[in-house]
């Protein structure tokens, strides 16, 4: 009996949780993915298609899909939505001109049937840059308070230093099993 329980427990504990990392090009998605994985900055080039890595946090396994954010690739984001539990939206906090596009993409995703149960973590990236928008400013502009059907959290961060990233992952792990 104990062996059966142990096997079931190990299956439950090692369950992978699918995460998509999205955002406009040059927001810092790939840098964040590899900060999660290696805790260091790696040289990146624009992602064509996707990168996928498994990240383990406190025995919780996340399968993270970093999806290219160029305009020509955004129409294919929906091919990654199936079975997604978490959306990480990376926002470039200094790119005020394209925040309206980010907002459009966010609400397009939230309306998609395959993401109806997904929780949303918004990383307000590049907080180390002079003149950046605060997480509160981004939250207000994206009207995050109007999102009622999805749990969400906004977190200030700096992908280059890793500041704020652990807090975002902790929020995600706290959401496991909460629906």
From Swiss-Prot:
InterPro entries xrefs: P-loop_NTPase (IPR027417), Small_GTP-bd (IPR005225), Small_GTPase_ARF (IPR024156), Small_GTPase_ARF/SAR (IPR006689)
Key words, A-Z: GTP-binding, Lipoprotein, Myristate, Nucleotide-binding
Cellular component aspect of the GO annotation: cytoplasm; trans-Golgi network
Pfam families in the record: Arf
Example GO BP: vesicle-mediated transport
Cross-referenced SMART domains: ARF, SAR
GO molecular function: GTP binding; GTPase activity
UniProt KW Nucleotide-binding keyword: yes
Binding annotation for GTP: 23-31, 66-70, 125-128, 159
Lipidation (N-myristoyl glycine): 2
Homology family: Belongs to the small GTPase superfamily. Arf family.
Function: Binds and exchanges GTP and GDP.
Stated name of the protein: ADP-ribosylation factor-like protein 5B
């Amino acid at each position: 009996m104990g062996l059966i329980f142990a096997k079931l427990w190990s299956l439950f504990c090692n369950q992978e949780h699918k995460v998509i990392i999205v955002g406009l090009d040059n927001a810092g998605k790939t840098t964040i993915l590899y900060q999660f994985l290696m805790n260091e900055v790696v040289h990146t080039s624009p992602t064509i298609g996707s990168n996928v890595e498994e990240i383990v946090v406190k025995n919780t396994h996340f399968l993270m899909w970093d999806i290219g954010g160029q305009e020509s690739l955004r129409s294919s984001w929906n091919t990654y939505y199936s079975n997604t539990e978490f959306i990480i939206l990376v926002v470039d906090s200094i790119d005020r001109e394209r925040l309206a596009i980010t907002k459009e993409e966010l609400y397009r995703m939230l309306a998609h049937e395959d993401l109806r149960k997904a929780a949303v973590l918004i990383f307000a990236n590049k907080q180390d840059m002079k003149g950046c928008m605060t997480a509160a400013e981004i939250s207000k502009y994206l009207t995050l308070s109007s999102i009622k059907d999805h749990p969400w959290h906004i977190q200030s961060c700096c992908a280059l230093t890793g500041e704020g990233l652990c807090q975002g992952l902790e929020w995600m792990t706290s959401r496991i099993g909460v629906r």
